[in-house]
Amino acid sequence: MVTWIASTAPAALVSLVSLAALTLTGHGGPPPLEWGEGPLTVDSLPRVTYVAHRGGAREVPENSMSGLMAAYRRGTAQVLDFDTRVLRDGTPVVFHDETLNRTTFLGGEVRGLDSEEWKGVRLRPRDRLPGSWRSERPPTVEEVLDRLGGRIVLMLELKDPGGLDRVAGMLRARGLTRSVFVNTNDPAVAERVHRAGLLTQLWRSADQMRGDRPERWRSWVDLLDVDIRARDDDLRRAVRSGVPRVWAHTVVTPAQRDRALALGCDGVLTDAPGRLARYRGRVPGPVSAVTGR
C-alpha cells in the first residue's frame, strides 16, 4: 500500500515543484561518451580512492540523478555509490530504504510499486542540504548505468539480492563488468556476485568485524568495505587479509579519513566528498593522534 505524506511546504509550492519535475526530462541528456578502447574501469582508480556515498548525501539529495550528476561534475570523488531496490515487477531502482516515507512525498514499501507507478514517485530533498534542489523521480538502475556507466566507476549495493541476475545482465550488456562494484553485507550473496563474473564488494559493520576472518574472502572479494568505527586491530586485520582493496565507510571528517589511511586503508566512502577534498592533508604518523588511543 502506498500513502501520501503531507509536506510542510505550502501546497502551492509543492504543486509548482511537482509540475516542474514533470515537465523536465530528468533522466535524459547526452548519449554515452565515446569510450575509445572501452569504458573507464577500476584499473583507472588512484592509489587512494574517494567514493561519494549515496552520491555524497550531505551535499546532494541521496540516490537522485541530479545528485549523482552533480557529484560526477564536481570531480571530488572517483567512484559514485548508490543503493538499489527491486519493484514488484522486478525492475531495479535506485533507492536506499525499504519504504518511501523518509525521502519522498509518499509512504509504503518500495516493492509494492511497479515500474509504471514508480514514475509518480518524487524525492523530497532535505532542507539542510546546501544549494537548491528540485523534486524529481528516483532513477532506475538502467537509467544510471546509461547516463554514467563507463564515464566514472560506479558502486551499487544490492539491498534486495533477488535483483542480482537482472543487474548482472545489465552490466554485461553494457560492457561494465569491470566498471561497477556490486556491494552486499552478506558473504553468501558476495559469492554469488563473484560467480556471476562481477566486481565483488563486501561491507562489514564494526560489530561484524570483531569476529570476521577476512582472509577467507581474499580469493573472491575484490573490495572489502570496512566500518570506520571499528577497532584499530580489526581494521588492521582487514588490511592484512589479502583482499586487493580495503576502503572505509562512512567517513565524514578529515580526522576519520586520516585514521583510515594511517591504518592502511586505500579508500574511503564519504557523505561529504567536497569537504574532504578541501582538507586533503597528510596521513598522520601515530594513529593515536587521530583516535585518542
Where are these regions (language model features)?
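Phosphate-group recognition and catalysis centered on beta-loop-alpha active-site segments
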Residues: V2-A11, A20-R293
